[in-house]
Amino acid sequence: MLHIERLSRAYRVRRLTEEDTAQILALCRSNPLYYRHCGTEPSEADIRQDMTLLPPGAAPEDKYFLGYFHGDRLAAVLDLIDGYPSAETAYIGLFMVDGRFSGQGIGSRLVEELLEELKTAGFSRVRLAYQKANPQSTRYWTKNGFQPVEEKPHPYGTMLVAVRNLSFSENPC
């Protein structure tokens, strides 16, 4: 079990609810490049669906749809699956920082704090996927130590599955 209050030293982290939908939508809209690559626009309906969407084999209690708050302002959103696709792996379904904070290193600091806590919680690796056609995502996740390990087709285009090991003795796959 994750201790979400330990995921950041600078931000208050809590589970997001439907009451947060408007703030989440505003944060998503501040990242138009991401949605341009998806070929869609963010919507309240999509956000509500994302709050409960699970990969095959994951249980609702494995999902953490979290917000990072600076005061009352939502600064970042994290969709994390505990123990997917294996018990020792955490899966990041979405990590998005308010576009107004872009380029300030906030996202990288939040990711590093997240990875530290996941390692403390016993995870040996973190997986995620991003669009191959999105150079911004490629630069960001590579800069944060994630290595692409495979390509997968997706309705939004080819996705790169990437892994970051939290223990040096593990194989990245």
What do these predicted ranges mean?
Residues 3-21, 26-100, 111-113, 117, ...:
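Acetyl-CoA-dependent GNAT
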Residues 108:
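Residues forming the Rossmann-fold NAD(P)(H) cofactor-binding site
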Residues 128-138, 155-159:
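Conserved beta-strand-loop-alpha-helix junction that forms the acyl-donor binding cleft
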Residues 118-129:
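Conserved GNAT acetyl-CoA-binding A-motif
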Residues 98-100, 104, 132-133:
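Active-site acidic-Proline motif in GNAT/NAT acetyltransferases
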Residues 142-150:
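Conserved acetyl-CoA-binding loop of GNAT-fold acetyltransferases
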